[in-house]
Amino acid sequence: MKFFAGQTVMDVLQHVSSPTTNLRLLSYCNLKKEEDGKMMLAIKEQRHRRLLTLSYGAMCFQFSNSVGDEGIEVDDDELMFEIFDALLRTKISNSKGMTHLYSWMRGVYLSTFKVEVQCDDYNSNLLEKDLAGEAQGLSQFVSGLADWIPSRVKTLAGYAAEGIIEAFKKHFDKLLVEYCPMAVAACSWITTVWTTIKEWVQSAMDAMSWIMAGCTELISWGMCVIAGSCALSLLEKALVAMGLISSSFDLAGIFVRSAVVGAFCLTVVNKRSRNCAELLQLVSLAVGAVSSATSSCFQSPVGQATDVSAESQSGGVEMLESLAKNLTNFCDGTLVSIGKTCNAVNSINTAAGTIKNLVGRLLSMLSNFAYKLLGLESTFLRDASVVFSENVDGWLKQISWCQDQFLAKAYINQDELMVLRSLITRGEVMQREMIMGGMKVSPTVCGLINKGCTDLAKLMAGAVMHGTSGTRKIPFVVYAHGASRVGKTMVINRLIEDFRKELELGEDCVYPRNVVDDYWSGYKRQPIVVIDDFGAVSSDPSAEAQLIPLISSAPYPLNMADLSEKGMHFDSAIVMCSSNFIECSPESKVRDEMAFRNRRHVLFTVSLDPNIPYDGDDITKNQIYEIKTWFHDSYHVEATFTSYGDLLAYCKNKWVEHNTEQEANLKQLGVKKESVAFQQFRSILDLAVFVNQDAENFKQRLETPDGRCHFVSCYDKSGILRHYTIDATGDVQEMEKVDSSLDDILLEKTNKMVLAAYKMIKYHKDTNLVIKTQLADLVDPTKYTADFQFDGVIGSPLFSSQVMPSVKALPLWQRMVLYTVGQNLGRTHSSWYEGIKDKCMLALSKAYSTEIKDWPVALKIVVGVILATVAGKAFWRFYASMADAGNGGHFVGAVASAFAGSQAVVAQSRKPNRFDVAQYRYRNIPLRKRNWAEGQMSLDQSTMLIMEKCKANFVFSNISCQIVMLPGRQFLCYKHVFASLNSPMYVDIYTANKKYKLYYKPQNRVYFETDSEIMLYKDASLEDIPASCWDLFCFDAEKSLPRGSFPAEILSCKLDRTTNQHIPEWADISARTVNQKLDVEFGEYQTIFYSYLQYDVSTKAEDCGSLIIATIDGRKKIIGIHTAGRANRSGFASYMPQVEIPVQAQAAEKFFDFLEKEQHVTEGIGKVGNLKKGVWVPLPTKTNLVETPKEWHLGTEKTKEPSILSSTDLRLGDKQYDPFVGGIQKYAEPMGILDDEVLRHVATDIVEEWFDCVDPQEDTFEEVDLQVAINGLEGMEYMERVPMATSEGFPHILTRKSGEKGKGRFVYGDGEIFDLIPGTSVHEAYLTLEETCADTVPALVGIECPKDEKLPLRKIYEKPKTRCFTVLPMEYNLVVRRKFLKFVVFIMKNRHRLSCQVGINPYGMEWSRLAMSLLEKGNNILCCDYSSFDGLLTKQVMHLMSEMINELCGGSSRLKQQRTNLLMACCSRYALCKGEVWRVECGIPSGFPLTVICNSIFNELLVRYSYIKICQQARVPATITYGFSTFVKMVTYGDDNLLSVQSAITHVFDGTKLKEFLKLNGITITDGKDKTSPVLNFRNLEDCDFLKRGFKKESDVVWVGPEEKESLWAQLHYVTTNNLEKHEAYLVNVVNVIRELYLHDPREAAELRRKAIQNVDFLKENPKDLPTMAAIKEFYNMQRQQQFVDSNDNLDSLLNPDFLFVAPHRKMHEAEMELVPKWYLRDLGKAPINVLTGEADRICVLVNASIPDHLLPEKVVNISWPYGPGRGGLPTHGWAQANLYNPNSAVVKKLRTLVNQNPDDRVDICFRHDAVPVAIATIIFLVHLGKVKGRSANEYLTKIIDSAKSLKFLPKECDIIF
């Protein structure tokens, strides 16, 4: 077929429709190739034959339109089977189908026939008919441009770069005006594109420096193709945005495919190249990559064909990768490995070096391709591939940097020397490659590399002789020890080789030291020194003695044989030794052997494994390496390695640690003092000026009265000439009114003087080298201010900071001389790199431009595209900004301003926005509107609430994923990322108010049964959000949303890597529901959507996880989560999956009004809301402590007062203090995250100790039943009943009525056995919690309540501080007791073997046992006290503690999960502070049943963790590091602890180190005895306290623990009268004080007893109420003989009515006993009764039972009384007078009524406790009722009194009987 200019359409059609062509097409279709994909095979099928014919015709018309005047002729077979085949393959792909083929065909036929060509059904989805008209103008314009380019190829090939751009511009503008005037009118910026492209070309040239010399034409081709495609895509998108056209026509695709490919075809066919098909495919690959990148990025969001796949974004790196992958398969088969490189680029954050390496490989492939296919040997391609692959430019810059460092300091330290040696090694490798022929480069580049190597050698020669004589890094020593013939030398040599490779050093970087040689012959500061057979031969000085000064930071001059090397200092970085000896020789004359031992940083012993034979290929295969450290008089094996790899890794890690430590040490030594060099400089400067002042000046000085003469004349900063005089003292003054005719004379005199001065300073033998090298900076006039102050930098910043004070201290006249010198010299500093670069550019420019001129255009385009891609930084910045510009009007403005440059004038003010008045902030950053958003940003409260509560980010490494928080400690995420996160790791969770750590566990992921792209993650460590947030989600969006489109919003928060902040964004969108197939891809991940939301807006990478919000039933709700995007024009969201909403046990959140934005947020707390109006929580505001009369104080000092319970307490005066705020603030700052590996090691050790205490027969850890949880077990130590008088918690407290008490109103029982009352709020909440706590962490609400206690006066008047405790809900406490009661029993029972001392009896022998156990380790004891211990615990530690307890207790997986969730709930809860609601995310609440146990375990974990970390830092042997129990004895009780430390390790582990280490983790610890002390020192045991008790030794075996006296006196000043009368409460206290004082001194106790009897009236009457000293002594003797448990934390709890003064049980032998006819005493322990139903035939009188009155049956009465002290179980005197002795009391009346109504029924007096007081009360009631006569009662009671002495008060009180 012949193509020629002026060819008619009929000529081409005749060829296309000829039978011969049809036959060839049939043959082509039948020709199947291996590389044919499914689309190529499809188009060759019979049914697609017409499409194939149209494609072939389009190609022929393209050729016909592209030929020049001379015409071309192509063989028909070649045209069909090679050129057409290659063309088809470039336009058809499996992923895009035939989309590109349609676009190209449409453009060609539009250009040829000026009409739209229909291709049957193939383009029905591609182009709607009504768009043809408006598209025509644009299509004609592009086709015209495409037709023009081929006809100009010949001419363009000879143009300069400027000509290429101008030619493009000229025709581009002409066609625009002719075919598409609306584009010019609407988008005037399109005509300025080419000016911008010129700037980009220049920018690219500057970026690539010398290697681009002569390549402007290539860059121009590349930039024109890339930027032209980009501009056309932008133009088209802008016209769509402005409404001028309604859809995209892929202008960029038509442009690059038709124009550039056509130009190429013309060239190759003209030259009759036999490889035209290959070249066609090559250039098509290149321009295809460009087209797909630009058009996909800037596609218009409307009018597109429906696509069935979602894609990622494109950019520069992606373009290169695409090109590389295609070229890999296409070019030389031996270069397939490049594909792996390209894939690797995806998996890393692309760095410049990686891109350069990729470009180098691409150019290398093209070089091979050009040579093999075209016979073209390209110098430029070879040079460029080497320069990019080896980063020659970076290598040269590093050489220049080394030279600058040497000149700046006149020396090079060892680190810089190692860089220098590494550069030499790289240079030698490149030289070797060039010599061996592996690297072919031009002579200029070869000379450049040789020049670099030569100058490096010169620099090295000078550098090795100029080391630092100051402080240096201590060398790193590896010392291999072992018997002879075990391979020590071989393993050391292998270590040297591996270290050399690691540091990129050459083979000459190792110096073998012979210790027998007196001189260091051949030492050139090699970084590695090896000493083989260390100490094997005797020498003087010995090898050991020589090593000590070498391995030091002090300077060490060497003994050199050559005079020229004298003064060299040792500063090698690494010393490797092998030796048969591990210790110093006795003859070594080393006086301090520790000095030698400490100089070996890695010491290992080599031995052979007898079970593994020697292997010549791997001599280390049968070696064993034992890492050893010296500690406490012996060597300890720290680790044993059986493989060399492990040893190498260990050595490398130690090397890094050592290097880091040495760098930190050197940084601390920066002392600023005047350099000796500057002292010299100042004296030489004085001398220079003196010598060079002419005789006339000195004569003037002598003759003038003030000795003043002309000094210098110079131009100031404004260019004005000024003259100055000077006197003998050096005072300088400006001369005024100088005759201008003298200017030249004075200037000449000045010039002579200052130039002579400069030469003298420069060449004077005494001028320091540093000054000489930095003189250019000192005389630079631009670095001086108008008053001659120096304000520049001298050399390196470090050097400048050291000498700047000296420069500024120079006298004014000296600074003026330096300034004037610089003016006269006018020098500029040029680096070594700049010098060689300029020379190289001159040589390369001509060679490259000559060569490139003759290249085929195809090669120019491909290479130009690659170079423009890697070098066009300015273009890619523009590209990125446009990719983010969105759609619509914002996009049009962004493009116009980007291309307009400085021509456009932009208004500086902006339209006011009503939203700006109170702009919503998220994470303290204003929410911004997306560029393409159309609506005005006006967010309502529900939208803000969604952002605040539900939006979060999951951050790991440098990746930030958006997630959606749900109530119940869970979040929603997307599969395509989270399904691949299969390893546990620490991540950061960023919420609206804070950031916190989460230990991510893959097993916590939950997949939904549906094919949802969304997945769920649950974790107890997540911070919860309010349950009310469930209302913000729409889980049935498909049903709730309208059909078709509806308005919605998209909310996102993505990481801005420039500012490293998460930026919140909002936009309005139009969404629609779609039900059709959508393929989604992410790397290798693939999935299919069948039902989703779609919105046609510009979404981009990292948008996944954004919230889609719409209005449902009048309220904003989350309807979906963005999970995919397509071509920067469409977004897709998955519907919210159906998440099970957990039931809340408390349902407490309904009482809260949540704030829209949290307040007062810290890491641990944040205020989230307030109690709703009308909700009030009763809290104590007045103390229950009553002050006693002064005479009852017994002369003791008042040291304590009741705590402050409210902010209105009068004792506060003017101080602003709220105890509630103070209580919540202790949780504000929890401690930091701990090293998980070490923490788990500690936990494992503790659990092992627990298992050691387990008795399999007795210790079972199953959960107990509810009754046991409430009542405890009778006779079972440590399992007491729940205190019934304490608060029931929230929200149950809201229903409490006046007179009702706490938990007691929710239980019923007979006084001994209690149960929950069915149907109450507590009972229902208990059932719900039991059911749900295995599945979710319960939402816990606690009431913060100030503690009513006695505090030191300083905490009242000086710095008020009231402790708060937390009241937790009753049902939570009951469930916790059920799950953990057996564990608590176990810990308390084994306190003699464990650290936790909860339950210890301080009066018995346990205190002695405690003291003796501490003294076993010695008498070095740390007595510690924590600050705000309650708020320190983090979720990390709490979760670990749950794992520890589960490990010990076992049980089903459900029970284990229940335990974990219950524990996690208490350190992530709500706290009520008066009317405020706070979120608390750390700490253990004090009202938690396990508080003291958990605090004790936490205390132990902290100390043991600190011990290991401190030992690791001290590098002690592993046997010590992991031997805590061997070297330390620790006891804990909550936050109290004592540590007894063995003397052997007190230098490693002491109070100072413990205090400093804990401080690093946010924990403050002080001396427990003296809390104001700034230090924590060891104490003797007698000087310590524990539980506010001291240690006093009474004998060798007995220690007592007296309570501190300040606490004792307070008991005499204040008493608690909750359950007792005042004098009874005081009696309890005074007895306790006398007992405690007895432990201090029996004489003091006896004296206090006497004072009490003398001063207290009621004690005068009954002195026997106070125990005598003998009785107290007997009390302690009795205590020491028994193992009593003390389960109460303090004395005040002893006054609890549940435990108070119950006499030893005097039970009846039988279940019943008849007192009088029909009146029986009944022991419920033997004959129980159902108290809720009673018994039909009798009246039941329950004594001291607990049952609400409204639940009592008709014939059941309950009588409860408060116990009185010392009254034998009878009620208090006051209650007895009112109810027992009074015949008309309410109790007596109630009994009388019942008996009268049921005269035939028997009466059972039912009781559970002591029968005696019940019998007494019954007798008295019988007297009142007339059933017993007074005389009979008298006799009966008298018998009882005779057997119970405590009842002798009865005759005085009960006068109705006695």
Swiss-Prot record:
Domain Peptidase C3: 936-1141
Keyword 4Fe-4S: no
EC number assigned by the record: 3.6.4.-, 3.4.22.-, 2.7.7.48
GO-annotated molecular function: ATP binding; cysteine-type endopeptidase activity; RNA binding; RNA helicase activity; RNA-directed RNA polymerase activity
Keywords: ATP-binding, Covalent protein-RNA linkage, Helicase, Host cytoplasm, Host endoplasmic reticulum, Host membrane, Hydrolase, Membrane, Nucleotide-binding, Nucleotidyltransferase, Phosphoprotein, Protease, RNA-directed RNA polymerase, Thiol protease, Transferase, Transmembrane, Transmembrane helix, Viral RNA replication
Binding site for ATP: 482-489
PROSITE patterns, A to Z: PCV_3C_PRO, RDRP_SSRNA_POS, SF3_HELICASE_2
Alphabetized Pfam families for the sequence: Peptidase_C3, RdRP_1, RNA_helicase
Record's protein name: RNA1 polyprotein
Organism: Cowpea severe mosaic virus (strain DG) (CPSMV)
